[in-house]
A protein has these predicted regions:
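Short beta->alpha connector loops
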Residues: 226-232, 254-256, 287-288, 383-387
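Flexible loop residues that form catalytic
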Residues: 52, 194, 254, 286, ...
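Hydrophobic/aromatic ligand-binding patch that stacks against planar heteroaromatic rings
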Residues: 89, 273, 308
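Active-site mouth of glycoside hydrolases
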Residues: 2-245, 257-258
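Aromatic- and carboxylate-lined catalytic core of secreted/periplasmic carbohydrate-active enzymes
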Residues: 279-281, 288-292, 298-415, 424-441
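Conserved beta-strand positions
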Residues: 49, 191-192, 251, 283, ...
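Glycine-enriched alpha-helix->loop->beta-strand junction motifs that scaffold or abut catalytic
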Residues: 241-249, 276-280, 312-316
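Active-site clefts of carbohydrate-active enzymes
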Residues: 197, 248-257, 264-300
């Protein structure tokens, strides 16, 4: 088996998806069913689910007292019933769920003001007997990194601030979550959403150990989502260098890079770093939508990132929710369909991405990307038409060439081409295409 990819029910599986919210489990049953059925019909099999409850209308995990404060020792059944429903409905549809335990953004600004974990909002602790404050300002950003004091919620561990009281309730929450997830075999675990570089990596390592202890020998697959887009940055060493702690690498922030070649190189760097002990590289978010903020990029950025990730050897790729992503929009659905069409004919599980673009001649920046099962199959992605030469000089035999029109999810008629040559590949038109060459047996 290729350990850069997931196995599910004994078979290798490529995970692609899109969804319209961060915390799908919070939706009512009708809306949830509609979303999951739409995803499945598009060939999607992967969703993200943050356990956050910081948006308007979200239900909280804890019971409320008469005075409106929360009691962290009592559960709100509605929250956990909704979570259980998501687990059941995704399992029935063979959709893999990547669950995020902790939500960084719930500890800042307005979200923290409303949070049950805020000392003013519960009956279980105060600012006197814990390290937690009533308010935390959001981080500041400059020169591609983040500044500002960390929130104490992520510093409760014995080796950090040793805030045992808050940690007791955090462990109760994690135990309850795992009571729901551990009976299922289609769950991936991510510790935190976008933990920033000013937070010590011990937080993620601690909860990875905690999940493994609770799992008591059952297989679990765990990662941490670091905020820094550049995978060569020190923050990512905490994951890349620790295969015994994290079972896969979360590469979501790669799509925050807007230079297409940098986006490709970043993913190939992660693959190179993991090559001696391969692990799946997941993208639970792919940013970009015309509707979104400028930092996220536009529609075109999103779909190009999706295809570069696919050709580049990603194990999972999901369109982020609107407005900063395409979610499960009509455009996203078209691209999911096309990805599935390609995966039906091209063997991603045996393929090696052309990290340095060797084998492609006459290539301009962001013109074409190659992955191949050497001497057998070649897939070349063209983000916007163009032409390159594919080096088949040392490769004998004849090949079937087909073009996938990505925007329309359909194939052109097959043609026969010969090896032992530099083969010119000219995209049939502008727009996004994949050329697939398969050796004729």
């Amino acid at each position: 088996a290729n350990r850069f990819f997931w196995q599910y029910q004994g078979r290798p599986v490529l995970l692609v998806g899109g969804s319209d919210t961060v915390n799908l489990f919070q939706w009512n049953e009708t809306a949830l069913r509609k979303q999951l059925d739409r995803l499945r019909a598009a060939g999607g099999n992967y969703v993200r689910n943050s356990m956050g409850s910081h948006y308007e209308g979200d239900v909280q995990p804890f019971a409320q007292c008469a005075d409106g404060r929360y009691d962290l020792t009592r559960w709100n059944p509605e929250y956990w019933n909704r979570f259980e429903r998501l687990l059941r409905m995704t399992q029935e549809r063979d959709i893999i769920v990547q669950v995020e335990l902790w939500e960084l953004w719930a500890t800042y600004g307005e979200h923290w003001k409303q949070s049950p974990w805020n000392p003013v909002n519960n009956i279980n602790y105060t600012t006197e007997n814990t390290r937690l404050a009533i308010a935390y300002p959001r981080p500041q950003y400059r020169n591609g990194t983040s500044y500002g004091k960390p929130t104490d919620f992520f510093l409760t561990l014995p080796e950090l601030q040793d805030d045992r009281l808050v940690l007791t309730y955090q462990k109760r929450f994690a135990e309850k979550l795992l009571q729901h997830t551990l009976p299922y075999g289609h769950v991936l675990y991510c510790i935190t959403n976008e933990i920033h570089p000013q937070y010590p990596p011990e937080w993620g390592w601690y909860w990875a150990r905690f999940i493994r202890q609770q799992a008591a020998g059952r297989p679990v697959f765990i990662t941490e989502m670091y905020w820094t887009p550049d995978f060569q940055a020190a923050q990512h060493w905490a994951s890349l260098e620790r295969p015994e702690v994290f079972d896969f690498f979360e590469a979501s922030q790669n799509s925050a890079l807007h230079d297409p070649e940098a986006h490709w190189r970043n993913l190939q760097y992660a693959r190179r770093r993991l090559a001696s002990r391969p692990r799946p590289i997941n993208h639970t978010k792919t940013y970009g939508a015309d509707s979104g903020p400028s930092w996220a990029g536009n529609d075109r950025h999103a779909v190009e990132c999706f295809w570069r990730s696919l050709i580049g050897g990603a194990a999972s790729i999901r369109f982020h929710r609107p407005p900063a992503g395409l979610g499960l929009s009509d455009l996203a659905v078209r691209h999911l369909r096309s990805a599935r069409l390609l995966a039906e004919v091209f063997d991603f599980f045996r393929a090696v991405p052309g990290a340095e673009h060797r084998g492609l001649f006459g290539r301009a920046p962001n013109e074409a990307y190659l992955t191949s099962v050497p001497n057998e199959q070649y897939a070349i992605y063209f983000p916007d038409g163009g032409s390159v030469e594919l080096d088949l000089v040392e490769v004998p035999g004849s090949f079937t060439l087909r073009w996938l029109n990505i925007g329309e999810s359909r194939w052109t008629p097959a043609q026969e081409v010969s090896g032992n040559a530099r083969l010119e590949l000219q995209a049939p038109a502008k727009g996004q295409w994949v050329a697939v060459l398969s050796l004729r047996k």
